[in-house]
From Swiss-Prot:
UniProt xrefs under NCBIfam families: murD (TIGR01087)
Main subcellular location of this protein, as a coarse class: cytoplasm
Family (UniProt): Belongs to the MurCDEF family.
Coiled-coil residue spans: none
Annotated Gene Ontology cellular component terms: cytoplasm
Entry GO MF terms: ATP binding; UDP-N-acetylmuramoylalanine-D-glutamate ligase activity
PANTHER family the UniProt entry points to: UDP-N-ACETYLMURAMOYLALANINE--D-GLUTAMATE LIGASE
Catalysed reaction equations from the record: UDP-N-acetyl-alpha-D-muramoyl-L-alanine + D-glutamate + ATP = UDP-N-acetyl-alpha-D-muramoyl-L-alanyl-D-glutamate + ADP + phosphate + H(+)
Gene name of the encoded protein: murD
Subcellular location: Cytoplasm
Enzyme Commission number, as recorded: 6.3.2.9
UniProt name for this protein: UDP-N-acetylmuramoylalanine--D-glutamate ligase
């Protein structure tokens, strides 16, 4: 970590805690700043605030009092989840207090080069794939960012010989100014988080900030399957490396079932460790980063063939009596489940689906359900899921929860079949989040394996 004097004896307000705010507070204190933390959660329910107070950091909890900004703060570090129309943020802007993001703070002190990954879907899987391949190739890749490891915490142990492989959300990117990765990946761009950004154009503009400071000596990896990529590519100073599953490009591409990088065959799509058309795209982006980083083809192929996915994201859980289980609890919409289904033989597949409908058009799923061996349906959207199953002429059973659904699926499955949890719905009708839903699937698998 670079020891910089920019924040020495400067009064800085951290607005919002969570993991990133806590990490930023500790880093700034280490850099000699006079830190105040403000979080809306009450102090007695706020272990992070309690821990910071014990370290001598000033904390104000329970609300965001605008009058706090009457103090003479020289910077604000804003939690990514707090929108720019928040009264505290608006007041800071009116007072011309510079607002920093936690990832930019990490960038200021990083000795290690940064590979930044953003996009609407596939960020976590691609980030993890890239780190795995770099580490397999003898490099030292450190996961950081939106993947659960705050960048301003990871950067404190990173040295010049490391590489920060950083997952970045639109919330994290919208406020950056100086941030400059050496390699950036945009997996894809879809209309999401519009409640935060206001429009798709503003959402894209936030994502596009990842390359704002890049030069021709830096590399920007874009999804050439999307028309928007060609438009955006004309507006960057970075060297663009495209990837595509639909056409041959001057980068990474799929041709006749083989993944290539600039005419060099790397791996067959059927040899990838994770199924699904979206994972071919993720692998192509990873191949581009790996080749730019000097990783040998055989190491890339070996690593991608053994990659088992990320927890809850088309995660290969294991086998019982030659029946394979996949946990795709993160698939909370139709598109995600469609992509998951693309990687399997429907005739040998039992799909567990259903949950809280957030405006899905279930008829869109019907073509992807054709030929399924069986569906196990659950949750608030069960009636709509049943109608889709009927249109696809797929038989189904109902279950009260994921555990019961998994047990039913296992009873129906035969040697060589696959059981896939890919709900196509949110979890909140039955579970606090998709992680808890997926964990129930994993726990049930463990019980079934123990009884087998």
């Amino acid at each position: 970590m670079k020891v910089i004097s920019n924040f020495q004896n400067k009064k800085i307000l951290i607005l919002g805690l969570a993991k990133s705010g806590e990490a930023a507070a500790k880093l700034l204190t280490k850099l000699g700043a006079l830190v105040t933390v403000n979080d809306s959660k009450p102090f007695d329910q706020n272990p992070a605030a309690q821990a910071l107070l014990e370290e001598g950091i000033k904390v104000i909890c329970g609300s965001h009092p605008v009058e706090l900004l009457d103090e003479d703060f020289e910077y604000m570090v804003k939690n990514p989840g707090i929108p720019y129309d928040n009264p505290m943020v608006k007041r800071a802007l009116a007072k011309e207090i510079p607002i920093l993001t936690e990832v930019e703070l990490a960038y200021f002190v990083s000795e290690a080069p940064i590979i930044g990954i953003t996009g609407s879907n596939g960020k976590t899987t691609t980030t993890t794939m890239i780190a795995d391949v770099l580490n397999a190739g003898g490099q030292s890749a450190l996961l950081s960012g939106n993947i659960g490891y705050p960048a301003s915490k990871v950067v404190q142990k990173a040295i010049a010989g490391d590489t920060l492989v950083m997952e970045l959300s639109s919330f994290q990117l919208v406020g950056v100014n100086a941030f400059r990765p050496h390699i950036a990946v945009i997996t894809n761009l879809m209309p999401t988080h519009l409640d935060y950004h206001g429009s798709f154009e503003d959402y894209v503009a936030a994502k596009w900030m990842i390359q704002a400071q890049m030069t021709e000596s830096d590399y920007l990896i874009l999804n050439a399957n999307q028309e928007i990529s060609a438009t955006l590519a004309k507006t960057t100073q970075a060297t663009v490396i495209p990837f595509s599953t639909q056409k041959v490009v001057d980068g990474a591409y799929l041709k006749d079932g083989i993944l290539y990088f600039k005419e060099q065959a790397i791996i067959a799509a059927t040899d990838l460790g994770v199924p699904g058309s979206h994972n071919i795209e993720n692998a192509l982006a990873t191949i581009a980063v790996a080749k730019l980083s000097g990783i040998a083809d055989d190491i890339i192929a070996q690593c991608l063939s053994h990659f088992g996915g990320v927890k809850h994201r088309l995660q290969r859980v294991g086998q019982i009596k030659d029946i394979t289980f996949y946990n795709d609890s993160k698939s909370t919409n139709i598109l995600a489940t469609q992509k998951a289904l693309s990687g399997f033989d429907n005739s040998r597949l039992i799909l567990i689906a259903g949950g809280l409908d957030r405006g899905n058009e279930f008829d869109d799923l019907v073509p992807d359900l054709l030929g399924l061996k069986q569906m196990i349906i659950l949750g608030e959207s069960a009636e709509r899921m049943k109608r889709a199953a009927n249109k696809a002429e797929v038989s189904y059973l109902e279950a009260r929860n994921v555990a019961e659904a998994t047990e039913l699926a296992f009873k129906l499955a035969q040697t060589g079949d696959t059981i896939l949890l890919s709900p196509a719905n949110a979890s909140w009708d039955m579970y606090p989040n998709f992680e808890v839903r997926g964990d129930e699937f994993l726990a049930t698998f463990d019980c079934l394996r123990g009884d087998a």
